[in-house]
């Protein structure tokens, strides 16, 4: 027992496996073994019956039919139009798991016979044509649902070129191409106030609500829906670019940007304007606001189209005369701004000789104004000028300033009276004194209110520097120096006397005229200079001794404005011996304003 390893089992279980097999004499017979194997559980393993042919021909026929059906399906898939398949199941046909591959093109052609390339290109370029099924028209406002909208979405997704599909559907719905009504903006950042927007497959409720929601953004709205297409003409209150318009439409109509076509309209195309004008008269069109200006100009007959047949220069001259415009630049700019309201201005802008007419207009206005000035007396001129001044002022500020300069007001008033009446030897007044005493400011304020002319001795080298004296009622020669005094002493004695002189004018023969009342300012007291003794009797002088006073805010203490001079002349009208305007017809019989244009047929007499 010492050789046994491991633990010993309990009693009765000494061995855990059978070590030897028990022999049996019964199994020694081979015949019995074969008989027992034949009668095993797997019986009838071999079929020893006689063979017959069976139904093999039917099986072969079934296999041939199946193969023929497969070949037929392949031919149908190759040659049959997808339209038949789409009619069977449109939704199933619209589902595509793999994207369509575009045809490939080689950058460099190979130098061979071309046979292989031809076969390859034919195999690669063949792409199945997609035919979009016809979509039913838009239902009435009380009907419709999400099913039709889903069909429109499906039709748009099936198309390979969505923009071309939208353009085709737009033309099919409205009978006119989208590009025939619009002009193209390639940039998304270009702003415009007017936009034509076409939206595909909009829900009916959102389509109706957009008519009210867009009114807060637009001055004019034109909306129409046919079939699945909706057309908008929007005139926004402020300029918008395409991106802003798309954002507004997608938010309001709950559509994708691929469903939108947007371009600005053609503003100068009469046919396009007639489309919008006549379209608003048809059924199913909603409009809000007045017609845009470009539609009205191209379609509505009125003063801007029927009456603006020819340009009338006299109307332009009358306008410039009434507005006191003499310069060519002012006339051109002002009359161009008048174009939206005046038919004659529109005709002038359309003319090829705008500059020629502007020059002629300015020339005629100067002629008329000069003739009007010469026809007026000094009293009429002053009365006309001060009544053009708006507002009221204090005449006492002028009197206080003269007293501040220690000038006798009675003497100044008498000298001004003689000056305005052009009394010989009293036709010129001189303000002299130290610098910064207000001489030029006082003289310039008087010249401004009376619309006089200013002379500059810097132009004395030209023989035409005195030409403005023949075109005004009063003139000012500022800052007279010694060379100017010498010139006046030598050449202007007769002019200062108030007698007729020969005045040389540019492009014209010398004219016979009198010098108008002349005001001089200088730092030199000519009465204290013996060299100019011949001028002493021709010039009345007033000395400005004190510096011009200023306030703490650097504004003049004495207001020498147009309103102050208006009050001055009104208050001292009789003291200056100016004529009463009642005697000249101001309060008597009515006087017609000057008219230089032809009277219209319907004008009141």
Curated annotation (Swiss-Prot):
Gene Ontology CC terms: host cell nucleus
Modified residues (Phosphoserine): 81, 89
Source organism, top-level taxon: Viruses
Magnesium among keywords: no
UniProt xrefs under PROSITE patterns: SF3_HELICASE_1 (PS51206)
Post-translational modification: Phosphorylated.
Catalytic activity entry: Couples ATP hydrolysis with the unwinding of duplex DNA by translocating in the 3'-5' direction; ATP + H2O = ADP + phosphate + H(+)
DNA-binding region, as annotated region: 145-308
Domain SF3 helicase: start-end pairs: 407-557
Main location group: host cell
Membrane-crossing residue ranges in chain numbering: none
Chain ranges for the short sequence motif Nuclear localization signal as given in the UniProt record: 76-78
Keywords for the protein's UniProt record, in alphabetical order: ATP-binding, DNA replication, DNA-binding, Early protein, Helicase, Host nucleus, Hydrolase, Isomerase, Isopeptide bond, Nucleotide-binding, Phosphoprotein, Ubl conjugation
MF terms in GO: ATP binding; ATP hydrolysis activity; DNA binding; DNA helicase activity
Motif mapping: Nuclear export signal: 88-97
Record-annotated disulphide pairs: none
InterPro entries cross-referenced by the UniProt entry: Helicase_SF3_DNA-vir, P-loop_NTPase, PPV_DNA_helicase_E1_C, PPV_DNA_helicase_E1_N, PPV_E1_DBD, PPV_E1_DBD_sf, Rep_E1_papillomaV, Znf_lg_T-Ag_D1_dom_sf
Cross-link (Glycyl lysine isopeptide (Lys-Gly) (interchain with G-Cter in SUMO)): 514
Annotated EC: 5.6.2.4
HAMAP family given in the database record: PPV_E1 (MF_04000)
Function: ATP-dependent DNA 3'-5' helicase required for initiation of viral DNA replication. It forms a complex with the viral E2 protein. The E1-E2 complex binds to the replication origin which contains binding sites for both proteins. During the initial step, a dimer of E1 interacts with a dimer of protein E2 leading to a complex that binds the viral origin of replication with high specificity. Then, a second dimer of E1 displaces the E2 dimer in an ATP-dependent manner to form the E1 tetramer.
Protein name: Replication protein E1
Source organism phylogeny: Viruses, Monodnaviria, Shotokuvirae, Cossaviricota, Papovaviricetes
